[in-house]
């Protein structure tokens, strides 16, 4: 039995003397290759052998952790890099970096970015580059943080050896954990917490900074989805670096910056001065889908290719009338479910369609699926917070319906991308909306694994292929007809008051912010002036169902308290009296609702402004409306709405009659609250085109 050399120089000499014995070992090869040692140059004695041997000596002497790792593997059979077999060469290069400087990982869609970050943390801890208690990772939503935890557990069952799950959280959770210790702030509001932490760190004394280090040492901070950073969050990261010497690790895809409405910017990721790594292999999609989505990238990053060499059909673009597209989708679904689970399919729609109805496009698809008895897993809600509230669990036998924003981080075998660029309400985008649309399209078209269909509605009034899709090389897709290419024009930017919530919060002093915290904790309703009145801030045209219900409940309580009859529901009364204008399709319905209902248009107003209306609007009005009935005195709807309403008309009528007789429920809102909610649902279902809710 040969003697075991001591670790250090004796081992280095031993290793080089016995290089032929160990060079064929897979684990040894993985170690050496990860640190840019050319294993082939060590297999035979030649002129490349000596330079390569010197590189090994330098590696072992400057990175003793690596030397000890190989030593323990050879003599004790302990390997700390077996997990690298799960990763690609690009990922291994990032994971095994021996420098502990600032880094940024630029990763394409489907490249395994989060897995690589987890692998990097494991390698750093197990090779002595960092302590597990000093590594933190933050993301921007509870869903993302939960998903991070899930992936750690699935990837490495021994995760407790290299990470503290409590250190991997949302940015607001981290802010709260610091502020509640040093300032006793306990707000749940993300924006307030972020601004408060940023302000605190900017003004913190040495004593306050030292008090933080007593319970939280942040040596390494990984920021996932860093393309979604805003100025406040980036300032926090820089403050950590300034006060605690924190090493910053940004990870993200600059082409997936889809939360610009939250003031996020990919410039923080792109321009951050750090050691750069790239992941260009896409392990999700076929090369055909990758080629298509690559053409939609807003930022010219390194071109990505398939990491699996999977091939499949080209992307198919369908440009037909809505009813034809719906029939094709239905046929595909019926054929698909014969051998596969529908939960592997997603239909992706723009978050806000194009126009005043928040989810016009979603509603059209939702109603179509429901009317054809297709089970739907609705991965979105009608409020503006759909990213936070969306559910991500798939339901067997249910097709997934979600927004462009809601697709982030998800993947499906087959994807239908609904392209409503101009077809729903024919409203031109602003220049900013047009550019954001490119980011959204890239995200939506990079979700598919095997098959992808782009669906564009055409009609007599519009229906053009999305401008960005026309930039895709035709060799990357099949199309059923020559697409209509519209002339690219933009509507004027809407000018808003700068008094947005975030802007207002940023202006507040530390004392005013604390006052807000105290107000939020109060459970009773009262009024207190802590800042100049800004109640004129536009809340937007969207109202969540709960918000509408609360408003109606407020009015009901007010009238009942004064022993008055409740205020009436104009829409419900029209339903009861069957005042319907039935149009052929959702497109016509949406156009007429916008120009008549939204503006409460009368025949007199129509005649006075006729020259200012679009020709397609005039044609529709003349096609469906009679001068015997006032324009704004009817419900504009499709047969889908009629079919559902007629089946429930008696219930709606009886519910409304009960509601209008407060003496019979003793002017007590508790006795009528369920009826009130049902009436609100009917009204809401019509407003958002989700008629199925009426059931």
From Swiss-Prot:
UniProt record, GO biological process: recombinational repair
Annotated keywords: ATP-binding, Helicase, Hydrolase, Isomerase, Nucleotide-binding
Annotated InterPro entries: DNA_helicase_UvrD-like_C, DNA_helicase_UvrD/REP, P-loop_NTPase, UvrD-like_ATP-bd
Gene Ontology terms for molecular function: 3'-5' DNA helicase activity; ATP binding; ATP hydrolysis activity; DNA binding
Gene3D superfamilies linked to this entry: P-loop containing nucleotide triphosphate hydrolases
Catalytic reaction annotation: Couples ATP hydrolysis with the unwinding of duplex DNA by translocating in the 3'-5' direction; ATP + H2O = ADP + phosphate + H(+)
Entry binding sites for ATP: 107-114
Listed EC numbers: 5.6.2.4
Signal peptide (from-to): none
CDD domains registered for this protein in UniProt: DEXQc_UvrD
UvrD-like helicase ATP-binding domain ranges (all copies): 86-499
PANTHER family: ATP-DEPENDENT DNA HELICASE SRS2 (PTHR11070:SF2), UVRD / RECB / PCRA DNA HELICASE FAMILY MEMBER (PTHR11070)
Family in the record: Belongs to the helicase family. UvrD subfamily.
Annotated protein name in UniProt: Putative ATP-dependent DNA helicase R568
Organismal lineage: Viruses, Varidnaviria, Bamfordvirae, Nucleocytoviricota, Megaviricetes
């Amino acid at each position: 039995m040969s003697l075991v050399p001591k670790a250090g120089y004796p081992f280095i000499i031993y290793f080089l003397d016995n290089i032929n014995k160990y060079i064929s070992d897979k684990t040894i090869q993985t170690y050496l290759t990860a640190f840019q040692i050319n294993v082939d140059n060590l297999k035979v004695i030649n002129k490349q052998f000596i330079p390569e041997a010197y590189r090994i000596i330098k590696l072992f002497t400057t990175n003793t952790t690596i030397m000890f790792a190989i030593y323990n593997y050879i003599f004790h059979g302990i390997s700390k890099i077996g997990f690298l077999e799960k990763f690609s060469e690009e990922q291994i290069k990032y994971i095994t970096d021996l420098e502990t400087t600032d880094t940024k990982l630029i990763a394409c869609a489907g490249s395994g970015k989060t897995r690589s970050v987890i692998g990097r943390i494991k390698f750093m801890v197990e090779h002595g580059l960092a302590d597990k208690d000093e590594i933190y990772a933050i993301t921007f939503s509870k869903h993302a943080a939960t998903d991070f935890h899930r992936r750690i557990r699935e990837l490495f069952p021994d995760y407790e050896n290299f990470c503290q799950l409590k250190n991997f959280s949302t940015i607001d959770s981290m802010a709260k954990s610091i502020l509640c210790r040093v300032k006793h702030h306990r707000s749940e509001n993300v924006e307030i917490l972020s601004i408060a932490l940023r302000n605190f760190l900017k003004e913190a004394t040495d004593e306050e900074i030292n008090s933080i280090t007593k319970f939280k040492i942040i040596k390494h901070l990984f920021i996932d989805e860093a393309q979604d950073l805003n100025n406040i969050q980036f300032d926090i990261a820089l403050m950590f670096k300034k006060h605690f010497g924190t090493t910053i690790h940004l990870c993200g895809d600059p082409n997936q910056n889809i939360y610009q409405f939250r003031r996020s910017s990919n410039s923080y990721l792109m321009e951050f001065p750090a050691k750069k790594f790239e992941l260009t292999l896409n392990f999700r999609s076929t090369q055909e889908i990758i080629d298509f989505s690559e053409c939609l990238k807003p930022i010219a990053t390194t071109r990505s290719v398939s990491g699996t060499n999977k091939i499949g059909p080209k992307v198919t673009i369908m440009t037909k009338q809505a009813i034809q597209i719906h029939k094709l989708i239905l046929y595909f679904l019926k054929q698909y479910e014969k051998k596969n689970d529908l939960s592997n399919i997603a239909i992706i729609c723009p978050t806000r369609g194009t126009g005043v109805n928040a989810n016009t496009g979603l509603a059209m698809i939702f109603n179509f699926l429901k009317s054809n008895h297709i089970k739907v897993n609705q991965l979105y809600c009608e409020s503006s917070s759909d990213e936070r509230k969306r559910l991500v669990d798939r339901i067997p036998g249910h097709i997934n319906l979600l927004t462009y924003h809601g697709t982030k981080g998800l993947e499906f075998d087959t994807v239908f991308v609904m392209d409503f660029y101009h077809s729903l309400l024919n409203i031109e985008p602003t220049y900013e909306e047009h550019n954001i649309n490119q980011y959204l399209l890239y995200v939506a078209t990079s979700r598919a694994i095997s098959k992808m269909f782009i669906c564009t509605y055409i009609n007599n009034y519009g229906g053009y292929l999305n401008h960005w899709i026309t930039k895709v090389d035709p060799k990357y897709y099949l199309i059923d007809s020559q697409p209509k290419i519209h002339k690219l024009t933009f509507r004027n930017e809407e000018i808003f008051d700068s008094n947005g919530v975030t802007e207002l919060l940023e202006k507040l002093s530390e004392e005013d912010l604390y006052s807000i915290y105290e107000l939020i904790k109060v459970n009773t309703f009262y009024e207190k002036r802590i800042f100049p009145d800004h109640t004129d801030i536009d809340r937007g045209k969207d109202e969540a169902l709960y918000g509408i219900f609360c408003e109606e409940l407020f009015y009901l309580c007010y009238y009942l308290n004064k022993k008055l009859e409740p205020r009436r529901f104009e829409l419900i009364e029209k339903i009861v009296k069957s005042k319907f204008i039935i149009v052929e399709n959702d497109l016509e319905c949406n156009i007429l609702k916008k120009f008549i209902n939204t503006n409460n248009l009368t025949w007199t107003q129509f005649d006075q402004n006729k020259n200012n209306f679009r020709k397609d609007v005039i044609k529709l009005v003349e096609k469906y409306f009679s001068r015997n009935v006032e324009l704004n005195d009817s419900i504009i709807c499709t047969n889908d709405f009629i079919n559902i309403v007629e089946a429930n008309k008696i219930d709606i009528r009886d519910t409304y009659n009960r509601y209008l007789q407060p003496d019979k429920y003793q002017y007590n809102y508790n006795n009528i609250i369920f009826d009130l909610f049902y009436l609100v649902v009917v009204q809401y279902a019509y407003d958002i085109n989700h008629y199925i809710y009426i059931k």
